[in-house]
From Swiss-Prot:
GO biological process: diaminopimelate biosynthetic process; lysine biosynthetic process via diaminopimelate
Underlying gene: dapB
Residues binding NAD(+), per UniProt: 7-12, 75-77, 102-105
Catalytic activity: (S)-2,3,4,5-tetrahydrodipicolinate + NAD(+) + H2O = (2S,4S)-4-hydroxy-2,3,4,5-tetrahydrodipicolinate + NADH + H(+); (S)-2,3,4,5-tetrahydrodipicolinate + NADP(+) + H2O = (2S,4S)-4-hydroxy-2,3,4,5-tetrahydrodipicolinate + NADPH + H(+)
Documented EC number(s): 1.17.1.8
Principal location listed in the UniProt entry: cytoplasm
Example of a GO cellular component annotation carried by this entry: cytosol
NCBIfam families for the chain: dapB
Name of the molecule in the record: 4-hydroxy-tetrahydrodipicolinate reductase
Amino acid sequence: MRVGVLGAKGKVGATMVRAVAAADDLTLSAELDAGDPLSLLTDGNTEVVIDFTHPDVVMGNLEFLIDNGIHAVVGTTGFTAERFQQVESWLVAKPNTSVLIAPNFAIGAVLSMHFAKQAARFFDSAEVIELHHPHKADAPSGTAARTAKLIAEARKGLPPNPDATSTSLPGARGADVDGIPVHAVRLAGLVAHQEVLFGTEGEILTIRHDSLDRTSFVPGVLLAVRRIAERPGLTVGLEPLLDLH
């Protein structure tokens, strides 16, 4: 399988370049960064592209990839419901093309989101804290936003988080994602970390995941690359490939 990498000079992208090059069943067909023409992907007969670029350019990348029938595995964040709808509309004309967009490719992070969804209905309160390096473009992270949405979905019909706060500085209680407070920390020395806190009378449950190195994303990305052709259309999250429901 011929695989191209977009964002190849970034920290995650460079990790993916090394991972693809080291895989016996994959061939690195192209490695592109800012300013490189996307036509290098078609020139190299690329079948699947790994995209770790920037929210400002990822939609243009996807439009090109879909138009050319190239499968895409996307770790770039910043996706909204409107962006997902746009991707789906592009895919209508290319029914055999696959796009997988995931907020996090670390297997442990995907499992932590799954565990949080399972735990959500058993506790009165839930909050999410995500911690990342200071170069991250979006806040909160895609992982934190998706975690909060999964928690909110699991808590449908239950009372909202108890919170008597009546006065506060703007932002002190975090961002509100479907009723779940999400707090973002940006600190030098961090990579990617998340805590989900659940509380009820007499006990607290903490679900924490830490990516200590960007190689933590490699197994999930390569799994998606190898299996993406099995799932035509848009897939959001790595969960379907891990049989997590």
